[in-house]
């Protein structure tokens, strides 16, 4: 049986930490930035850890070897 492939879209958008949590970049920073304050824009930088249920769904359905 051949190896399962990882979904390319998920591979580009998410990463797993050593403890198994899922990291994603902050959402909501593509457009409509002019109506946001500088503090809001600053808070959208970087990455965030997904909530446990969302992380579980990403690992279960899109990363074939993500859940042991």
From Swiss-Prot:
Pfam families: Ribosomal_L35p. Keywords: Ribonucleoprotein, Ribosomal protein. GO terms for cellular component: cytosolic large ribosomal subunit. InterPro entries: Ribosomal_bL35 (IPR001706), Ribosomal_bL35-like (IPR021137), Ribosomal_bL35_CS (IPR018265), Ribosomal_bL35_sf (IPR037229). GO terms for molecular function: structural constituent of ribosome. GO terms for biological process: translation. Belongs to the bacterial ribosomal protein bL35 family. HAMAP family: Ribosomal_bL35. This is Large ribosomal subunit protein bL35.
């Amino acid at each position: 049986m051949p190896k399962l492939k990882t979904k390319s879209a998920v591979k580009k958008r998410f990463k797993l930490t050593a403890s198994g949590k899922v990291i994603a970049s902050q959402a909501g920073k593509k457009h409509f930035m002019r109506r946001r304050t500088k503090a809001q824009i600053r808070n959208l930088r970087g990455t965030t850890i997904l909530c446990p249920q969302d992380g579980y769904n990403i690992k279960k359905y899109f990363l074939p070897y993500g859940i042991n």
